[in-house]
Regions:
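Generic detector of solvent-exposed, compositionally biased contiguous segments
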Residues: 11-17, 64-84, 117-122
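Short runs of predominantly hydrophobic/aromatic residues within well-ordered alpha helices
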Residues: 26-34, 67, 71, 89, ...
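Short, basic amphipathic alpha-helical segments that act as recognition/interaction helices
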Residues: 24-49, 105
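Low-complexity intrinsically disordered segments
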Residues: 82-125
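N-proximal short alpha-helices
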Residues: 2-3, 66
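Surface-exposed, Lys/Arg-rich phosphate-binding patches that contact polyanionic backbones
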Residues: 1, 8-28, 32, 55-61, ...
Length: 125
């Protein structure tokens, strides 16, 4: 069972930039990125699973904490299939973080007041 993953370089750059401009910690941004990716009606594409590993190293406990089983269930619902532990972490978690970071970047760039905009998105979850 894996306990660490490395994001893509692009995801790390996005998380670093938003972390610096919004003063939110990386682990908070990672959870928001996962939420935005899961919120998407689009399934993960094959290319989402083939991003580089040149970004930040993240610990499983930091990402999912006590809600590990909940994250796995949400990802299984999104994928519409059972995920083994090896598929869930790091494969699916990394894919959702990398895709979600891009979505988070779009929300931050075009959403006006970032935190207010994210709370408005929550109403649609």
């Amino acid at each position: 069972m894996a306990f660490k993953l490395k994001t893509s370089k692009k995801a790390a750059e996005i998380l670093d930039r938003i972390e610096g401009s919004e003063f939110l910690q990386c682990y908070t941004l990672v959870k928001l990125a996962i939420a935005l990716s899961l919120r998407s009606k689009e399934p993960l594409r094959e290319s989402d699973f083939h991003t580089n590993t040149l970004g930040r190293e993240l610990n499983r406990q930091t990402i999912t904490g006590d809600a590990d089983a909940l994250y796995k269930c949400l990802m299984e619902l999104h994928a519409q299939k059972h995920l083994t532990d090896e598929e869930f972490f790091p494969i699916y978690v990394k894919a959702h973080i990398d895709r979600g970071a891009i979505l988070l970047d779009q929300e931050q760039r075009y959403g006006g007041d970032f935190l207010v905009h994210l709370t408005e998105l929550e109403k649609g979850l």
